[in-house]
């Protein structure tokens, strides 16, 4: 090689480019796609799509992209700065054993983690069954009639229980009582939730401080945060006598041995299923639960799986009672819950299927026995054990020696809980060993103590309370007995996965949901113990890796969005909305503007927006949209004038839910600011802005970022999610974690999935992120252009282009021949596709978002399917086929249809193979569901199907 060769060419360039794998269309296809959409280049497309006033192509400071290998090495280096000690901190978070068969075949399986929320039930039967197992598990443990399919975490579940108690209780009081022996993070979340709604939170001893006539409900801890187990029956009876509601915060492992809340008289039971096989993960994600009485089912928050029947009369699962939810009831919804924790609920349910009732009893009994031995040994050493009746946790008064005890425990590799005032808490779990117990004894005894004699002399009795042992049978349904060998369980999980459609099989073109690639490299770090086995309240000097990770994400999210500060605490987009509105509320109140309580929300907004505004104590005022789907600026001006001096905020989604960049967004922001309000820009559609526009620089004051959309955390069949918020510097003092504001139980929300988004940003870099946004916009316009001659595209921007999604109008087809959006959605299943978003934001339409990850071949396959369906509708329009005889009305077609008697007006091939015979064809496991029948005959736990259907 010549010696004078320029040094820049000495070393060969990297051959790996992650962005080219993340982005679907190949460079050779882009020219044809641009020709179809009518743009001369990608830059031309962006110039004609994004308003010039906000377009920003400059580098955002993210830096150059890393390869997958380099990004994983960087994350490994970050993880190595976390110290994995044995955690006995407790406080609602415990070490646990995730069975490897569940880790590999659920948590690490894209058939499970890339699925969407099961709103299309026919293609979601597998995860619906797993979630029904979860509901059955919770209902059994709690002894209550009905349980939901998960909430975000225990703290928010308790806040939801408070809200439910206020809705269903007979008391007219405005105060809610909280047991002082409740986890402190839960109390903080409850206080945050209550304050904007005008409810007082009274914290005290329920046996001495509770005046049942002065509260609408009470939260009792069972067991308490200290570990103490108290019989709540007298307190519950006193509450009921005054028309108040009794809620119990429970430990689901303790409920294996303790009497169920339902048997004790409780109306609501809540808790976290984390210790059923889900790692602590520095706070999450974990599936919380709520169970309640049948009478309250229509007021319960969160998703609810029920049993219905399909078109052949066979049992099938679906999401039930959806009229409770935010996407329908908006500000009148029971909650703003949207994303829940489906994947984690499924893991917890499989943990119960794996162990069965006998295994759970053995784990619970061993855990209690370890705690009893620990307590007895400490008493022998002369320690003052405050907790006398307990399941797994004890509290010791160590006085002035507490710091030394805690330090000696850390030196031996164990974290105990500093409970304050010289008190030390310690919790046992299924991973606790005799060596752990001995090390704790040694921490209390000090150096040189001989513990062998103590161990030999111990006479340990159980410390479970008399009269509170579980009396009801546990987990009697066959599903908790039928899959006990690993072979059987493996095949059961595979059979469930095969029933569903997820991103590993097909495009999921759901508008406003951003179902993009969840790259395998991004997922790998979440199971590393340095991320997974960290307690959220571990000492700061042990979690320097997480501190570095949080700082990286806060910096890059600020750079991407143009904001000045970020909070990572909200663990869903809806929680992010709520947190952002609380920040706005705090800002106004600090300035003496308590009267600012009006939240302006466009008619096209996500259902979570009005629900979140109501939770933040604001009044929702709807702003009209014009015929082009944009905010009607004249109506906005009128509403501002009508509510002069009271405007707190506007919540606006950008690009709009109609799939266009509104040209007047800067003017809208200026109008609201001139009226003294703040601009909440919903980040649900941020995938159309990253690298090309920054909300914080064109007028917005706060946004949430759906990390499970734009930044590649998978949807998990309905969760987990993350919804961090970015704010301008004037709102930074009011972020969660400051001034006592807590919207989630853990300080950094679902911290263990943050490496996914960090890896994505690292591997894309500035240019890759910009390319991803550009290609998302190209893909949406390509679909709009290909479908335009067959279905009207409802909204386009000023220059005739859509943003990252498009809306096709199907209403005229219903008017003409009676074909519904459901008919087309179900017919798409026969073509192997998940339907787009149905009837939102406009009834009778599809909202289609392909994302940047889908290649031209898959886009064409989808468009070909939609065009073929339009041809079938044309047959009905021409009178050659009656609508009731059309394959559209019988879709989806099942293997039972194919093999059974065929008395239909079209051929088997036309019905079952609309795209031609395909050896890899997806078959719906059930026919079309009868939704109304399912709500009329509600069953939300594993039923005896045969008798149920006959009945």
Curated annotation (Swiss-Prot):
Name of the molecule in the record: Glycine dehydrogenase (decarboxylating)
Pfam families linked: GcvP2_C (PF21478), GDC-P (PF02347)
Keywords: Oxidoreductase, Pyridoxal phosphate
The EC number(s) this enzyme carries: 1.4.4.2
Domain of life: Bacteria
Reaction catalyzed: N(6)-[(R)-lipoyl]-L-lysyl-[glycine-cleavage complex H protein] + glycine + H(+) = N(6)-[(R)-S(8)-aminomethyldihydrolipoyl]-L-lysyl-[glycine-cleavage complex H protein] + CO2
Cofactor: pyridoxal 5'-phosphate
Native source species: Gluconobacter oxydans (strain 621H) (Gluconobacter suboxydans)
Its job: The glycine cleavage system catalyzes the degradation of glycine. The P protein binds the alpha-amino group of glycine through its pyridoxal phosphate cofactor; CO(2) is released and the remaining methylamine moiety is then transferred to the lipoamide cofactor of the H protein.
GO CC terms: cytosol; glycine cleavage complex
Subunit composition and interactions: The glycine cleavage system is composed of four proteins: P, T, L and H.
GO BP annotations listed: glycine decarboxylation via glycine cleavage system
Keyword Oxidoreductase: yes
Gene3D superfamilies hit by this protein: Aspartate Aminotransferase, domain 1 (3.90.1150.10), Type I PLP-dependent aspartate aminotransferase-like (Major domain) (3.40.640.10)
Molecular-function GO term, any one: glycine dehydrogenase (decarboxylating) activity
TM stretches of this protein: none
CDD domains given in the database record: GDC-P (cd00613)
Keyword DNA damage: no
